Amino acid sequence: MAKKITVVVDALTERHKKQIEQIAARYGYTVTFFQSNREAIPHLSDSEIVYGFGKKLAEAATGARWFCSSSAGVDSYRDTPVYQRKDILFSNSSGAYGVTIAEHIVMVTLDLLRRQMDYRQIVQEKRWVRNLPIRSIMGSRVTILGTGDLGRLAASRLRGFVPERITGINRSGVCDDPAFDFICPQTEVDRLLPETDILIMCLPGTSETDRFMDARRLSMLPTHAVLVNVGRGNAVDQRALAELLETDQLAGASLDVFEQEPIPQDDPIWTCKNLLITPHIAGNMTLDYTVDHGTDLFCEDLENYCTGRPLRRLVDCARGY
C-alpha cells in the first residue's frame, strides 16, 4: 500500500495543512486534502490513513489502517468497518471541542437562569419590563453527567460562578479533577436528581446512555431546575422533557443535540415552551482554537502512529467512546 494520507476537514487553513504535511513528509507519507467526502471517496482505496468525518467516508475507507474521526462522538460509525474490524485503528478528536462547548454551556445556562428568552420576547413586543425574577449559578447545586473532557471543562468554567457544589457522575465514580466537589457513580443518579438545580448532560451516544434521562428521571428534578444537553440527543426522552416544560414542571432546558437531526419541520419541539434550541453548533469547528487544537491532536497521533507508539485517542468500541 502507498504511504498515503487523505484528509477531509474543510476548516483547515494552509497553515494547518502545512503542519500535517511536514510531519507526514518526515516519515515518507504524501497527503491529499479534499473539501468534501463526495470529492474524497473515489480516492480512498489506497489511503493508509484517513482523517475526516462521516459514515460514508468511513465505509469507503476499506483499505485504511488508521481512521481518525475529526469529531469527538463516534456513535454514527457503529455500522462501519472502522468500528467493527480489528485490523483498523480507530481514533477520534476527543479534547478538541472542550473549550467551545464549555463556553456554550455557560452561555445557555445563564440565558435560562436570567430569563433571556422571556426578555427577548418582551423586547420584540416593544414592551419595557424589568422585573422578571431571575436566578444565579452562585449557590446552585450543579450536577454534570459525564466527566470526560466536556464535563471537566464545564465544571472548571462554572466553578468561577461560586455554585454551592458541583457533582460529577460517571460509570466508575472516580475522577481526580479538582473542579468537582464530589464524584458519584451512575448508580447514585436517582438520589442526586432531586437535589439538582442545574443539570448538565455531557454523555456519549451509546446503548447504555440511550434515554438515560427518561420520563421517570426527568420528573425527579425540582420544578425550578434547568437542563442543558450538549452530549447526544438519544440520552434524553424529548417528548417527556417537552411535557414537563409545557406544564411548568421544569423551569427551562437547552438542547444542542436531538433524537433526530435535523429536527423535522413538523416536530412540536420547535415551539416548546421555555426550551432554547441550538442546531448542534456547540462543538463545531467554527472557533479558531478548535481547528488549531484538533490539528495538533491529529499531528500528535500521526507522530505516534509513524513511530509505532500507541494512539492517545484510540476509541474503545466496546464502550462506544
Pin down the residues of each PLM region.
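Glycine-rich, N-terminal phosphate-binding loop of Rossmann-like dinucleotide-binding domains
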Residues: G54, S71, L203-P204, V230-G231, ...
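Oxidoreductase and adenylate-handling cofactor-binding alpha/beta cores
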Residues: A102-D118, F161, D296-R309
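Rossmann-like dinucleotide-binding domain for NAD(H)/NADP(H)
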Residues: H224, V230-Y321
